[in-house]
């Protein structure tokens, strides 16, 4: 079930040491992935903004994507983007990058903010990404939702406030 939520607009992700393996360098940032069997975190660091704390190099965290394994797909638990980097559509780019580079299937989070619904709406507009929905996690009823003004619109069933699950895979 995907429900609508509201979050505060200001986010400061701060400085931290780079964690995980470097999986790519895009848009002037380093993208690192830390993965276990059931969880994965993807961090985006600004290469140009850093400071030294106790003789260790700490870079500014630009974006964070937290994923957990559920029903054969990677469930989006949390995506955050630092307020200083607003307007660059980093979350959209990060979703596409993760889908293409890691070759995984993403499953929409069970609670989505306005920004989260917008990200999935823009993913559906991309020709290199296939977005589909199931009436339930184990359902055989599959729908290919259309893009709406700000959120996806299902053809066969309501995507929000029901038990529907939304997925994205690189085409």
Where are these predicted regions, by residue range?
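Non-catalytic substrate-recognition and accessory regions of acyl/acetyltransferase enzymes
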Residues: 1-86, 93-171
């Amino acid at each position: 079930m995907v429900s609508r939520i509201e979050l505060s607009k200001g986010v400061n992700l701060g400085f931290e040491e780079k964690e995980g393996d470097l999986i790519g360098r895009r848009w002037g940032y380093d993208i690192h992935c830390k993965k276990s069997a059931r969880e994965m975190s993807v961090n985006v660091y600004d290469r140009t903004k850093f400071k030294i704390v106790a003789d260790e190099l700490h870079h500014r965290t630009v974006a964070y994507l937290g994923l957990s394994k559920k029903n054969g797909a990677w469930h989006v638990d949390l995506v955050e983007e630092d307020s200083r980097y607003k307007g660059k559509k980093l979350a959209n780019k990060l979703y596409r990058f993760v889908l293409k580079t890691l070759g995984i299937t993403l499953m929409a989070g069970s609670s989505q903010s306005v920004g989260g619904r917008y990200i999935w709406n823009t993913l559906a507009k991309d020709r290199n990404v296939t977005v589909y929905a199931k009436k339930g996690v184990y359902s055989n009823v599959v729908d290919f939702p259309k893009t709406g003004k700000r959120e996806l619109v299902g053809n066969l069933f309501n995507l929000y406030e029901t038990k529907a699950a939304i997925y994205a895979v690189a085409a």
